[in-house]
Amino acid sequence: MKSDLRYFFLFCIQVEILAGEFNDSAASEMFIFHNGGVQILCKYPDTVRQFKMQLLKGDNVLCDLTKTKENEDTVSIRNLNVCKFQLSNNSVSFFLYNLDSSYASYYICKLSIFDPPPFQVDILSREYLNIYESELCCQLKFWLPIGCAAFVTVCVFGCVLMYWLTKKKYPTSVHDPNSEYMFMAAVNTAKKPAPTDVTRNLELPGTQA
C-alpha cells in the first residue's frame, strides 16, 4: 500500500528543467529522466585521468566521487556520500530519486583535476532543476490524512456500536445484589420419619388380667 502511494506521488510530480548560466549548449544533457527519478550527467574532458567530481545542490555537496590511479592497472574510486553513480570515460552520472518540491534548486557539477597537472578546479555545468507538483497531488496530500483519520474514527465507532448491541441482545446472567428478586435456596418438603427411640405403651382401663 505504501509503495503504491509512493509511485502515485512520483507519477504526479513533474520536473521542469531550466537552463543555467553555464554551458547553455549542453542544457538538455545534464538532466535526464530515469526510472521515476533524475539522472544528472556531469561531463569532463577525455584527457583527465585522476579527478574528484562533486554534485552540489546550491552550496551543499550531495555527491562526492574521487577517481585516482594507484598504478598502471589499479584504479581507486571513492564514493563518500554513497550516491548511486555511473562512471564512463568522459562523464559521471548521479541518480536522484523520490524527488519532491524541496529538491528544486541549482545543481552544479564541480570538477577537481589531479592528473594531468597542474591541479585545477572547474565548474563544468550549472543548471536549475524546477520541481513542482500538480494541483491534484497537492489536494490529495491535504485530504488523504484527513480521510484516513475519518476512516479510523468510523471503524472505532462501528466496533463500539457492535459491542454495545451485542451486549444488549445477550445480557450477562450475573446476579445483581440490588435486584428486587432474590434467588431462593431449594427447600426439601419431604416429611422426616418419626423418631424410633421413644415408644409409649398405652393401656386401656380394664384390659389387665
From Swiss-Prot:
Record: glycosylation sites: 23, 89
UniProt topology in membrane: Single-pass type I membrane protein
GO-annotated biological processes: cell-cell adhesion; T cell costimulation; T cell tolerance induction; T follicular helper cell differentiation
Keyword NAD carried by entry: no
Post-translational modification, as annotated: N-glycosylated.
Extracellular topological intervals: 20-141
Entry-linked Gene3D superfamilies: Immunoglobulins
Keyword Disulfide bond assigned: yes
Domain Ig-like V-type: 30-133
Disulfide bonds: 42-109, 63-83
Domain of life, source organism: Eukaryota
Gene Ontology CC: plasma membrane
Secretion signal span: 1-19
Protein task: Stimulatory receptor expressed in activated or antigen-experienced T-cells that plays an important role in the immune response. Upon binding to its ligand ICOSL expressed on antigen presenting cells (APCs), delivers costimulatory signals that enhances all basic T-cell responses to a foreign antigen, namely proliferation, secretion of lymphokines including IL10, up-regulation of molecules that mediate cell-cell interaction, and effective help for antibody secretion by B-cells.
Protein name in the entry: Inducible T-cell costimulator
Organism: Bos taurus (Bovine)
Gene (UniProt): ICOS
